[in-house]
């Protein structure tokens, strides 16, 4: 994942649900998705890191707040509207880490994976309770 950071300036600020003057992207992948959301006429509104979802960390057993990358409301081909929560992650962080010689790295990757799984479980539950969808998009989904 490319770690380009900055402030996104939307062409269509009225589509943004939040402060359109402070839309932060934390990677070139997020920037790419923001451009797509801003330009796509089927996107009714979108937001970035605006919704906190509580989850219990498997690392410290404390409740934390997860801010998903995007919340999107789109108009489908059938005319119905759908709300989705989207998370952008490298595919490597969506799979159980494989033990390697570097134990410290394996421990860190395992912790990241465990925390991500719990965040995504909480987001999926939140979405099901609200009639929304939850998706994790990787570089393959983004065509990178």
Name each model feature, range by range.
Residues 1-144:
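Electrostatic, structured charged patches in enzyme active sites and in nucleic-acid/phosphate-binding
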């Amino acid at each position: 994942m490319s770690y380009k950071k900055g402030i996104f300036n939307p062409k269509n600020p009225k589509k943004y649900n939040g402060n359109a003057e402070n839309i932060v992207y934390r990677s070139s992948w997020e920037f790419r998705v923001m451009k797509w959301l801003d330009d796509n006429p089927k996107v009714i509104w979108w937001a970035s890191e605006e919704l906190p979802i509580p989850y219990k960390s498997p690392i410290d057993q404390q409740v934390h707040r997860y801010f998903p990358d995007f919340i999107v409301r789109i108009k489908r081909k059938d005319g119905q509207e759908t709300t989705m929560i989207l998370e952008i992650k490298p595919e490597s962080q969506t799979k159980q880490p494989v033990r390697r010689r570097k134990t410290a790295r394996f421990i860190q990757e395992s912790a990241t994976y465990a925390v991500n799984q719990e965040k995504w479980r909480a987001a999926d539950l939140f979405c099901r309770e609200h009639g929304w969808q939850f998706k994790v998009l990787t570089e393959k989904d983004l065509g990178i």
